Amino acid sequence: MSKVCVLTGKRPKYGNTVSHANNHVRTRFEPNLHTKKIWIEEEKRFVKVKLSAKAMKIIAKTGTAQLAKLLK
């Protein structure tokens, strides 16, 4: 299962979690992804996509036209 946002392209980042004692432990920081069913007006159908929280805000502001272009 891919952890990549369809619209923004966000993917996992790698880094360290640092404790109070300054111990470094390698970790993987996951993007805030949600699987959503979105109605694409241009195609008259629902599309199931993985979106980050930022992408959901973009769609709420601008609409699904940008997403429809990416899916073609």
Curated annotation (Swiss-Prot):
One GO molecular function term of this record is:
structural constituent of ribosome
Record flagged with keyword Ribosomal protein = yes
What cellular component GO annotations does this protein have?
A: ribonucleoprotein complex; ribosome
Kindly state which keywords UniProt assigns to this record, in alphabetical order.
Answer: Ribonucleoprotein, Ribosomal protein
**Gene Ontology annotations of biological process type:** translation
Question: Pfam families, from UniProt?
Answer: Ribosomal_L28 (PF00830)
PANTHER family, alphabetized? 39S RIBOSOMAL PROTEIN L28, MITOCHONDRIAL, LARGE RIBOSOMAL SUBUNIT PROTEIN BL28M
What family does the entry list? Belongs to the bacterial ribosomal protein bL28 family.
According to UniProt, the name of this protein is Large ribosomal subunit protein bL28
The organism named in the record is: Chlorobium phaeobacteroides (strain DSM 266 / SMG 266 / 2430)
Q: What is the lineage of its organism?
A: Bacteria, Pseudomonadati, Chlorobiota, Chlorobiia, Chlorobiales
